[in-house]
Amino acid sequence: MIAVRHLTILGSTGSIGVSTLDVVARHPDRFRVVALTANKSVQKILEQCRRFEPRYAVLLDEASAELLQVEIRRAGLATEVLWGVDSLEKVASLPDVDTVMAAIVGAAGIRPTFAAAATGKRVLLANKETMVMAGRIFTDVVKENHATLLPIDSEHNAIFQSLPQHFSGDLRAVGVRRILLTASGGPFRQMPLAALENVTPGQACAHPNWVMGQKISVDSATMMNKGLEVIEAHWLFEASPEQIEVVVHPQSIIHSMVEYVDGSVLAQLGNPDMRTPIAHALGFPERIETGVNPLDMFKVARLDFEAPDFERFPCLRLAYQALASGGSAPAVLNAANEVAVDSFLKCLMPFTSIPAMIEDVMQTIGRRDIATLDDVLAADGMAREAAQEWLTCLA
């Protein structure tokens, strides 16, 4: 008999959340949705409530929650509507929930992800900011509360699959020489450097291989996404910066690789579809159907690899710099990047100002020691304030 997993999906209306529900719908005998959460996407979460009938639906925005409550009653659903950060933490730590998909984008996802880990849940981690901003604190919470952590980012999931199942945090003990973290290079990999000043949000969001949300698409275009993933890999796999090498692989077929001391390189391949890593984590240690098309190696035909261009992608350099600095530096990097990307998407500054803002904010704030989650959030707040001041000066 299959044990039913009871799920809270944090960020159910985003691309990861939607893909998660697609996989869940294929296995009604395996999964029961207890709670869904979103920022303020009333119509999307209403449609999801109609289909999955969760016990709770949480919106961060109060006015949106009031609108959803009206629609839920009109639809005759028993779903209870909640709002606010405290409610996100509540549904992430419900006693009868065993699995939490942490898919809220950005720093907003940190507190509910911590709540899930603190109550010993099986945490499916798609919110990379939790690891970037508070990696040491979060991993300590996971260990102290015997939570299970399964990575959802395609690259980290690929690394997880390429490591021995008995891996417990010591790469050298299992014979690993290094992690090869693949990157597509985004839509501007071959664009003349002089042309980057004038690229539009629409161009930056047009990823050549993946279908993603706007923020992560811009991060891919700047390669900040890969920089954040380097920091995440450092904490997930206890890898030193020297053990993590970024490899540009334009086809996005190899999702990452692990090189062993005997010269063997193990890789995870597949079509670029987030349902694959999501299903791997949902079903782990079993394999479950995803709806993803089989990989046609004859159609792929070739696989290319390049070294990253740090002149073209200064955000990648800044991420390595933040990792080396430690302390509050990764949180400052992340916060400044969130403000910069949001400003670019609103056409308030050019694409090339994204790394410029981040670097200036990192220099302005400097590095501070981090001991608690409150320290992390304080650094986040200072960085956002400095980024807004930078933006005001730009105008």
Curated annotation (Swiss-Prot):
| Molecular functions (GO terms) | 1-deoxy-D-xylulose-5-phosphate reductoisomerase activity; manganese ion binding; NADPH binding
Principal EC category:
oxidoreductase
Q: Which InterPro entries match?
A: DXP_reductoisomerase (IPR003821), DXP_reductoisomerase_C (IPR013644), DXP_reductoisomerase_N (IPR013512), DXPR_C (IPR026877), DXPR_C_sf (IPR036169), NAD(P)-bd_dom_sf (IPR036291)
- Keywords of the record: Isoprene biosynthesis, Manganese, Metal-binding, NADP, Oxidoreductase
Reaction catalysed? 2-C-methyl-D-erythritol 4-phosphate + NADP(+) = 1-deoxy-D-xylulose 5-phosphate + NADPH + H(+)
Name the cofactor(s) required for activity, per the record.
Mg(2+); Mn(2+)
Q: Where does 1-deoxy-D-xylulose 5-phosphate bind?
A: 128, 154-155, 184, 207, 220, 225-226, 229
One GO term under biological process is: isopentenyl diphosphate biosynthetic process, methylerythritol 4-phosphate pathway involved in terpenoid biosynthetic process
**What Enzyme Commission number does this protein have?**
1.1.1.267
Positions bound to Mn(2+):
153, 155, 229
One Pfam family it belongs to:
DXP_reductoisom
Amino acids binding NADPH? 13-16, 40, 127, 129, 213
Q: Which domain of life is it from?
A: Bacteria
Which biological pathway?
Isoprenoid biosynthesis; isopentenyl diphosphate biosynthesis via DXP pathway; isopentenyl diphosphate from 1-deoxy-D-xylulose 5-phosphate: step 1/6
The signal peptide here is none
Q: Which HAMAP family match?
A: DXP_reductoisom
Which PANTHER family does the UniProt record give? 1-DEOXY-D-XYLULOSE 5-PHOSPHATE REDUCTOISOMERASE, 1-DEOXY-D-XYLULOSE 5-PHOSPHATE REDUCTOISOMERASE, CHLOROPLASTIC
Query: What NCBIfam families does this protein map onto?
Result: Dxr, PRK05447.1-1, PRK12464.1
Protein family (similarity comment)? Belongs to the DXR family.
Q: What does this protein do?
A: Catalyzes the NADPH-dependent rearrangement and reduction of 1-deoxy-D-xylulose-5-phosphate (DXP) to 2-C-methyl-D-erythritol 4-phosphate (MEP).
Q: State the name under which the record lists this protein.
A: 1-deoxy-D-xylulose 5-phosphate reductoisomerase
**Gene that codes for this?**
dxr
